[in-house]
Amino acid sequence: MATTLATDVRLSIAHQTRFALRLASTISSNPKSAASNAAFSPVSLHSALSLLAAGAGSATRDQLVATLGTGEVEGGHALAEQVVQFVLADASSAGGPRVAFANGVFVDASLLLKPSFQELAVCKYKAETQSVDFQTKAAEVTTQVNSWVEKVTSGRIKNILPSGSVDNTTKLVLANALYFKGAWTDQFDSYGTKNDYFYLLDGSSVQTPFMSSMDDDQYISSSDGLKVLKLPYKQGGDNRQFSMYILLPEAPGGLSSLAEKLSAEPDFLERHIPRQRVAIRQFKLPKFKISFGMEASDLLKCLGLQLPFSDEADFSEMVDSPMPQGLRVSSVFHQAFVEVNEQGTEAAASTAIKMVPQQARPPSVMDFIADHPFLFLLREDISGVVLFMGHVVNPLLSS
């Protein structure tokens, strides 16, 4: 796959990573989400908004493209095509991660999708397009969309559309769903899992199960008051490489400032990716499970995306509308599920709407003790596409 990624697509991936880090910083700075564990899927949100941009015109399209950072709307479509066909292709039959991703466009029967939009949605995004009856069967359509998402995510995301969120005024729903389940290349022995203290942001502590490594070394980098752990997943027969990264600030209360630094310095993440294994002395990583949902409109508005939610929105490239007024976005529902244990990671999400500088030589022996709040992300390393990201402030909290 590495040879199939054109320069413009690689640039779009870099912008998608920047979009992910801006989202993470905004979520971490929100008092409500900062006080709990959080998880989201940048690639799910990015894909949904990119498809939305395909149906937008004039200033609305320009604002979506600026928020996504794809440079031009075609860059988002090229990225989506690569993501759907290569990055998120299932690898389970060859012994790699189980990956499933799907896009859906559900449009009221009173409207017709423009042929150009429908063709792009189907060909580039591999989207299903369905004509539905929001006007008289809104509850049934809600169940239909929720069941579709639940199936794609192997039951992990059950109600992406909350009860009552769709009614007879709804005209169109864009939805996607992502599922990932991978086993670590080097699995942890459950016999080595023991309870220990995890220190919370308020200075108190809880006892939680910590996994320990039976290996003599791990992929770890350490600099700038930050330790980063890389945990690779077993691969299939292609050249993709999925990994989870644990970003542990030295300061127990350093989560928010770390998220800000990641957002402010585009190359900060890449500079701190571990590229060699180092000998370890003590190693402790808590098991965690996160189920996180949000209505993301306000979050996106904080990133500068205003027009799609306003009466000045222009989605004239999406539908042939018999209505005197156009369409606007009313809600963006997003849910994510991430579980990390001794065997590997299970994760799901849904959204409705290189030459590298050398690293400093690491110490001969290093500790990695994740006993205070940290960030995590799951990405495909060859392309750099970030599938999931979030933070853990208390491993005992699941939602």
From Swiss-Prot:
Keywords: Protease inhibitor, Serine protease inhibitor. Pfam families: Serpin. Residues 344-368 are annotated as: RCL. Coiled coil: none annotated. It comes from the Eukaryota. The record marks 358-359 as: Reactive bond. Signal peptide: none annotated. SUPFAM superfamilies: Serpins. GO terms for cellular component: extracellular space. GO terms for molecular function: serine-type endopeptidase inhibitor activity. Belongs to the serpin family. The reactive center loop (RCL) extends out from the body of the protein and directs binding to the target protease. The protease cleaves the serpin at the reactive site within the RCL, establishing a covalent linkage between the carboxyl group of the serpin reactive site and the serine hydroxyl of the protease. The resulting inactive serpin-protease complex is highly stable. Inhibits chymotrypsin and cathepsin G in vitro. PANTHER family: SERINE PROTEASE INHIBITOR, SERPIN, SERPIN-Z1C. This is Serpin-Z1B. It comes from Triticum aestivum.
